[in-house]
Structures are given as structure tokens and as C-alpha cells.
Design a protein with these regions (language model features):
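Leu/Val/Ala/Ile-rich N-terminal alpha-helices, chiefly Sec-type signal peptides and the beginnings
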Residues: 2-63, 68-71, 75
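Charged, alpha-helix-enriched surfaces in structured cytosolic catalytic cores
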Residues: 11, 15-18, 22, 83-86, ...
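Alpha-helical transition-metal enzyme core signature, strongest for iron centers
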Residues: 27, 57-68, 95-102, 128-131, ...
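Short, surface-exposed loop/turn segments at secondary-structure junctions
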Residues: 43-51, 77-86, 114-118
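Short, charged, amphipathic alpha-helical segments
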Residues: 48-58, 86-89, 121-125
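Hydrophobic/aromatic-rich structural module bridging two neighboring secondary-structure elements via a short loop
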Residues: 56-60, 68-99
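Hydrophobic, well-structured mid-protein blocks that either form specific transmembrane helices
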Residues: 90-130
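Conserved small/polar residues in nucleotide/adenosyl-binding loops
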Residues: 141-142
Length: 143
């Protein structure tokens, strides 16, 4: 009696979990790339490798947006509990903003080409590592 609906419901839940895991993995990957971009920029300026990494961040951000839209569609069409739906969507939106901030900072480096005094390089690298570590902590704590 409940076999088909239950299997479908649990199947959708597993798929939703996989999509959210993919999203969190992308957030983590973008953070790791960003952690590498800052010292690369500070040491080499706007090198080809730097441009490639900025492009990589942009591609991952686009992929994360697609996953977010798919999760949103699934939640609205197939989730039975509206309160849980809004909580998950809000968390995803906030984490997507973090990816957007990473991307925005990469573009700022790429377009504006700021020149940081050498004495600040170590602190900027340390700050970027701390930011990435904080994002990692937040993303795995909330989902």
C-alpha cells in the first residue's frame, strides 16, 4: 500500500542529500582554490595560472548555482514539510553568497590588480586562510 510512495519519497530524499553534499563540496573546493589564489597573486601578480584559477572559481560558482536551483525545485515540488524547506533553502542561499564572495574577490584581484606592500603579504595570506577555515567550519556545521 505504501511501498511505491515511500520508495519515491526516500529516493528523492537521498537525491536531495547528494545534491546538497555536492554543493558543500563545491564550496569547499572554491575555498581551497581561493586559499591558493591569494599567495599566487601576491607573489606573481596576474599570471596565466592565476587567470586559470579565477576561471575555475567562476565555473564552480556556476555549477553551485545549478545545484541550488535543482535543490530548490525539488524542495518546492516534493518536500512535505514547508518549515524544513525554508530552512534548507536559506542555508543554501547564504552558503551560495559565500561562493559569490570568493568569486567577487577573485575578480577584484584580476580586474583592479591591487598592489599590496610586501610587509602585508604574510598577513593577507594568513587572513585568507582563516576566512577559508571559517567557511569550512560553518558549512559542515550547518548541513
Amino acid at each position: 500500500m505504501f511501498g511505491f510512495k515511500t520508495e519515491s519519497l526516500f529516493g528523492q530524499t537521498k537525491q536531495l542529500e547528494r545534491e546538497i553534499d555536492q554543493f558543500v563540496d563545491i564550496l569547499s573546493e572554491v575555498g581551497l582554490v581561493f586559499k591558493s589564489i591569494v599567495p599566487l597573486y601576491l607573489n606573481n601578480g596576474n599570471a596565466d595560472k592565476f587567470d586559470g584559477m579565477v576561471q575555475q572559481v567562476s565555473e564552480m560558482e556556476s555549477k553551485a548555482d545549478k545545484i541550488t536551483k535543482e535543490v530548490e525545485r525539488t524542495l518546492y515540488e516534493e518536500t512535505l514539510i514547508p518549515d524544513a524547506r525554508s530552512d534548507v533553502l536559506r542555508l543554501l542561499e547564504h552558503m551560495d553568497e559565500l561562493i559569490g564572495m570568493y568569486q567577487g574577490n577573485c575578480y577584484h584581484f584580476s580586474i583592479q590588480k591591487p598592489d599590496f606592500p610586501k610587509e602585508f603579504h604574510e598577513d593577507l595570506i594568513s587572513l585568507s586562510e582563516t576566512v577559508v577555515n571559517c567557511v569550512e567550519s560553518v558549512s559542515y556545521t550547518h548541513l
